[in-house]
Structures are given as C-alpha cells and as structure tokens.
Amino acid sequence: MKSSGSARTARRNAALPSTDAQTGALATVANGRAKPATKPKDSIRQTKRTTKAAGASKPAARTREDKDGPLFEDIRFLGRLLGDVVREQEGDTVFDVVETIRQTAVKFRREDDSQAAQTLEKKLRKLTPEQTVSVVRAFSYFSHLANIAEDRHHNRRRRIHALAGSAPQPGTVAYALEQLKTSGNASKRVLQRFFDDALIVPVLTAHPTEVQRKSILDAQHDIARLLAERDQPLTARERAYNESMLRARVTALWQTRMLRDARLTVGDEIENALSYYRTTFLDELPALYGDIEAALAEHGLPARVPAFFQMGSWIGGDRDGNPNVTAATLDEAINRQAAVILEHYLEQVHKLGAELSVSNLLVGANDAVKALAAASPDQSPHRVDEPYRRALIGIYTRLAASARVRLGEGTVPVRSAGRGAPPVRAVPYADSEAFVADLKVLTASLEEHHGASLAAPRLTPLMRAAEVFGFHLSSIDLRQSSDIHEAVVAELFARAGVHADYASLSEDDKLIALLAALADPRPLRSPYIEYSALAQSELGVFEKAREVRAQFGPRAVRNYIISHTETVSDLVEVLLLQKETGLLEGAFGAAHDSARNGLMVIPLFETIPDLRDAARIMREYFALPGIEALIAHQGAEQEVMLGYSDSNKDGGFLTSNWELYRAELALVDLFRDRKITLRLFHGRGGTVGRGGGPTYQAILSQPPGTVNGQIRLTEQGEVIASKFANPEIGRRNLETVVAATLEASLLPQSNAPAQLPAFEAAMQALSDAAMASYRALVYETPGFTDYFFAATPITEIAELNIGSRPASRKLQDPKNRRIEDLRAIPWGFSWGQCRLLLTGWYGFGSAVSAYLDGAPDAAARTKRVALLKKMNKTWPFFANLLSNMDMVLAKTDLAVASRYAQLVADRKLRKHVFERIVAEWERTAQALAEITGHEGRLATNPLLARSIKNRFPYLDPLNHLQVELIKRHRAGDTNARLRRGIHLTINGIAAGLRNTG
C-alpha cells in the first residue's frame, strides 16, 4: 500500500469549502493586498448583525451557512486586521511572502495539487531566518484569532437560541431538569438529596505542554471583549472606535513576545491559574449557583442549594516528577490564593457599603444587624441611621484583620478609614464560616424588610462566593509518586532501628511493619537525627500542609494523591507519613479516639495492569485494621483517581477507555458492598488520547452507578485557556459539568442499554485486539523508539520553556531512551504536532477487522456489524468513544505526517513504520465508516468539521516550516532565530489544533 495514495485520500476527506471567503484570509482582496484601514465597508455587519429580528426570528428557516455567516465574517475581519498589522510592522515584502504561502497552501489543500505542494516546500526553504519567524508568527496569530472568533460565535448562537425562546440546549441545567421531569426523577426530595450529597470539583493543573504566555492571553481576552461589542448596535463613531481598539490589540499581540525567555517557575504557574479566577471563576461560579437555583425554582424545587460545586488545584502541590515543588511552593500557592480571594471579598464589601445606603428612619433592620452596626468601629455621625453601612464597615475591618494575620501586613490592599483616621485593629474572623454568618445576617434582615432585591446584585453572589471559596480559594491536592514515599518510610524505619531494609520486605511484611508503627503512639522520627535531603523535603511538605490547614481551614488541603499506586502498602505509607508529621489525630486502630482528620489518601491507578488491580487493592485496604474507622471519620467517603494518560500510552486508545470502564464498574460494586460512597477523580487531559473531548458527553458516557453526584476531574494546563479565558465560555463549561452530573446520576439507565452484556463482550474482544495491535507497533517494533524521536518534535518540545516540570521522567540518552520513560503528556503532544494524533485512534481498525474476521460465516459477520452499529446508537460509552475518535481522525493528515517521516534517517525503518501507521489509519477510517454509516469525518457535527477544515491552510505552512527548521536544527545549525522559529511553530500548531497535550 502506497502512502502517497493514502495521503491524497486523507486530503480529499478534509477538503475545504469552495469559497475562499470562508477561510479568513489575511487579506480579503484578490490581488493579496489588504484593504485600507480607513475604508468603512462593514454594512453587512451593521444591517445583519445588529437587528434583533435578524438574529432571533424564524431560526428554523435559516441555513447552516446563514447561521455561520457571522463567524466567517469575524474571521475575515480579524484576518484583515492581522494582514494590515503585518504589512505595517514588517513591510510589503514579508506581507507578500505570507500571502503567497497562504494561497499556495490553500491550493494544495483544496485541489490536491502536487505542484502546489512542491512550490510550497520551495518557498519555505528559501525563507531567511528573519522571514521564517515572521511567517510563523503570522500563521500562529491567525490561529489564535480564529479561536477567538469561534468562541464568540458559540456565545452568539446560544444567545440567539435564548432570544428566540428555543427549548433548553443539551448541556444546560434547564435541559437536565426537563429530562429528569420527563423521566419522573425531578421530585423535590430527589433533587434536595442530590444537592445535599453532591460534590463536583474541577481541578486546575499545570503541565509540561502549556504553551500560552499570560501576556498573550490577556491581549486575547481584550480582543474577545471588543469582538463581542460588534454584535451590539453601534453608531458609526462607536464602530470606528471599536475597530481602532481592535487594531491596537492585534498590534500589541504582534509586538509581544510569543515565547517565554525562561522556563516557567511554579510561581508563574500559580499566577497563571489565578488569572482565570479573576476573569471567570470569582464572578461566574456564584452566578452559576444563581442560575441553578432559578431553574430549580421554576420547577417548584429547592430554592437554595449547598456549596456542592467547588474548585481544586494541583499547582503548588503536585510533586510527582517535579523537584521544583516543595513546602515553600505549597506555602506560596496557598498565600497567593488567599490574597486573591480576600482582596475580592474586601472589594465587594466596600462596594456593598456604597450601595446599601438603607436608612432606619425609612425602613427597619433586625436586631442582629443592629448588633453588627453597634460593634462596628464606624463612628461617623453621617451614618448613624444607616445600620447596613455601619455593619459592613465592621465586616470590612474584620476581613482586613483576617488578611493581615494570615498573610502579613500589606499583602492585600486595604482602604483606609479616611484621612487622619487611626488604623483600626479589629478582631479577625476565625474562619470563613464566621464571615458567611455575618453576610447571612445582612441578607436575612433585608429579606425581612422588603429589601430582597437589594441583596440580589452583590450580597447574594458574595455570600455564595464565601461559601464556595472560603479563605483558601481552591483546595490544593498534594501528589507524589509511591516510590518516593517508600524511600522516605524506609529511611525512617532504618534510622529508628526498626527495619534495616524496609524496601526489600514482602508486601505482607511491609503492611505488618506499617500497621505496627501506626498503632504505636511514639514517632519513628527523632529531632536528634539528621535525615536525607529527600526525607526532609518530603516530610516538610506534610508539615506545611498541617500548618496550612490550621491557618486556612481543612478544605485548603484535604487530599493526598499517590501516583503509581500498585500495592496496598502504597496507601498505608502515606498514612504513616501523616502520623509522623502530626496530620493524623488520635491513635490508629484504637477502639476509642481512633485516627481522624488527616488528608484523604487517594490512589491513582494509571497503567492497564494497575486499573485491572484497582478493586482488589481497595478491597484489601478496606480490610486492614483501623481503616474502617478512618473512613467513617471521612464521612464514609473514599476517592479513587483514574489516569487516562499512562493507560493510553500503555495500551492504546481503545483499551485505555475500556479498562477504565471496567475498573469503574468493579469499584462501584466493591464500594456498594462496603456501604462507602465512591468519588471518582478523572485525570483527563486535553487530547482525546488523554481522556479529552467534550466534557458533557464524557460524563454521560460513564458506566452506570459511577457518578452519583460525586465527581472530580482535572482541567489540564494546556486547555484551561480555551475553556475559561472567556467568562461566557467559562460559565457554559462550568454549567455543562453540573448538567451532565445531574443526568448521569439521576438518569443512570441511559447508559445501561438492554443488550449491555453482549455489548461488553464485544468491547472486550475489540480491546484485546486493539491493545495487541498498539503494543506491536509501539513496544514490539524494533527501532520504533528511534522513529518516534526522529519523526516528531519531542526533543524540541523538551527544550521549550513551557512548564515547570520536565517533559521526561529520565534524561533522554539516545542509547538508553525508552517510550516507557517518557511522560504521557509530551508523548501525546508530539503526535499532535506531526498531525498523526496516533494516541486517539491507533488499533481500532485492526480490532474491528479481527472481530469481524473472527465470525464463523458471512451471516455471523453481518450480525457482528449490526451489533457494533447498535452499540453506537444505544450505548453512550461506545458512541462517545467513536465520536472522539472521529474528531481526532478529522485532525490527522497523512500528507503532512509523511513530511515528518522524512526526518527519519533510516529509510527502511521510516518506510516500515510509516506504512504500518498509514495502513492502520485506513483500516480505522473504514471501520468507523462501516459502523456509523458516514464516509466523511464529523458528518454529524458540520460546524466543527468546517472549523477544522478551515484551519488546515493555516496549519499546513506551520507544519511544513517546522519540518524544515527541525531538519536544519538537527543538522547542526545553531542560529538562535531558527530555534525560536521551531518553538513558535509548536505554539502555533497547538493553537490551531486547540485540544492539545
């Protein structure tokens, strides 16, 4: 099978729409010249986009092209601005080069023109280093601007649906409640119990493939805001001003360094995460609670829900593979988080003081408010009749004192009491609950005295924010690898003279030693012994966690995740380390005063063997003496984390998903028998290969009984920006998690079709064959490691300053490097860069072929095909798996990937491996078509299909340039601009593909 033919097939499958206007050219005139900035030709936008009737009336009568017209209009507009800026900043020569490359790439993409491909390669090879950087920046920034336009269009379409009075959209709480009502599961009792017991926590993480600089994100945020303004009726003057501001922000983008000069520190990652709280979470999460309560009220359901939706973070606490995370970074993380939330509270309380000018000469206040007013330091005669203002001044001074005692003087900006006024030293709040109690006093009094509407705009959201964020903002998880814990425990045992070589003990003997040490009130650690740097560092993190909990409350740090959990002792070792550092209170295993109040130890099952062993490990853990009492103190809850990344690298896309499914079901059965509430923590990434894809479908496709209102899921560093940089998009993503959790919890039968046993048997057969195919390529093909390191930019990614954590667990010595030692995240990121995205599909085609070929006769084969089709139609798990794979295949490009294969010096190896990949791609595409009935990619999602196709002419030059630059770099060219060009292509391709990493 010749790869060139396959490449042509792939390009035809990804053929672009025929109108050049839809591609969003850098310039919009035929001769490649940009329109003059002064030309006020924007009448289409003014007449079509600013009239309410045009947006809202008769939506059913509009074609898809009509609906997407504003999107392409925005892309053209932003492309024109970028073209103007390129011409202005770099001159006509660079602009013409960029435009010529763009037109050639479009021709290559649309017409399968081999001559255009050769022309493109020649043009790219002739670029000077300076021109190369400019071309890469132009195409990269176009990808960023196209992303902004797409996000705006999603928001626009939702608004149009709302204005038209359309039925609630899937992924909204209103839609979920309608579904529950239809099924008879929307009673007040059912929903009250759901919200009382629920806990939903998105957990922000930082990862080695996070490529966005905060400066770039800030500029993009401004562009998104200004673009949204253009949907409103604007005067000619307002529109001209808007365009000038957009031009200024695009110019600022061009003049801003896209890459970091130095690798991110953990402190940088902390600040990056906090920026999303300021732009999105602090306002949108309380607003989401308001929306949920309003939707419930419409159905006559509970009017107020507890703080079931909270935020988590790994940044500053995740030590696995990152030696830069220490007790000091944990301290920095919690202090910066606390500073952000306390500053927010102070600002909101100050604004409330200006707004709640209620006079008791006109309306009353309850005794509790009067007591707060009397206790206030405010003695102004001008406010003697304004109890709410006086009470708020008292609350403000107590908040300021709370910030001062926790963070130090001057850490959080505090307004003075006025010129010449002495500083007020109020009593700090003991905890955030006391602050919430004071806000509740104000709310209750307003409601009692016809002032409920006064509370709604600011006081109610502030009270909700305080319930959700506390004084800590976000709960920081601690994480470390099990082998590190073992090393520290072994040192403690050895230095105490208990066991000379704990690590060499059998599993049973380890547990005996650990349980004995836990039951002994005497510590193993002595203040008179000097321990290794590793032991001191690890124990220091535990001690810092104890201090943080004392200072900011137990929610500030409450979970400890153990990477590479393979045995029961991996869990118990962390309990012992907690005992040694004072985190565990009471005596382990004692009948009275049993161990409690420590961090919940959470196993992370990552590889295929570990997932298969998960239920056994937890069963044996529960059976240990003292564990039952410990879990009872945890509220009879236990969390288990499942890793999507390593299981995929270990067994491939299909097997990873299936083994996760099986592990979840086994855990559900075990926990049900033990009467323990199971909370699954899904370690999902950005790419489909790492559990990515639409969150709504991902949660709905969970096995029956695995959600039950309890879910935590990672929001990985590399896709946080796409989900939460835009507040409106962020609100939608947060709501989607709630809606999906509601449906998955209270409509579990939707993922338990009648033929489930037959479906699962077929899935097991597919998984076995897929894993064999995947491992045959990745782990059993001689030379595959060399192929991977040559045919992807993995080495160059490792050099890029895109995260505080190294991209590999071990140094990549060419003689000793192994796929097993590479982190799963850069592994997936690299396959995305070369446009193969192998981690999201490889093995499926062979699996389906083997399953169908295994049928004894033609009739049996037909039955198997029918079963697979029924699985796709009636089993959300399988349908979601195929949908995600469909999206990945739409983003693959064998023609581009073949250019990367040319980087492999060994011709025989190159031909052997690449042809195997091409053959599997074709088998997979054919199998998917046979099951779904759709030959083309994303047939059921035309907007996404067009979005992906429209990106290709702007991604292609970046990929071709990346190959050319890597070739020069590896040949010994040390030009700094060349290296910078490679890193810029990595950034641009990641932006174009969106869900990367």
From Swiss-Prot:
Its cofactor is Mg(2+). Coiled coil: none annotated. It comes from the Bacteria. It catalyses: oxaloacetate + phosphate = phosphoenolpyruvate + hydrogencarbonate. Its EC number is 4.1.1.31. It is an enzyme of class 4 (lyase). One of its GO terms (molecular function) is phosphoenolpyruvate carboxylase activity. Keywords: Carbon dioxide fixation, Lyase, Magnesium. HAMAP family: PEPcase_type1. Belongs to the PEPCase type 1 family. NCBIfam families: PRK00009.1. This is Phosphoenolpyruvate carboxylase. It comes from Burkholderia vietnamiensis (strain G4 / LMG 22486) (Burkholderia cepacia (strain R1808)). The gene is ppc.
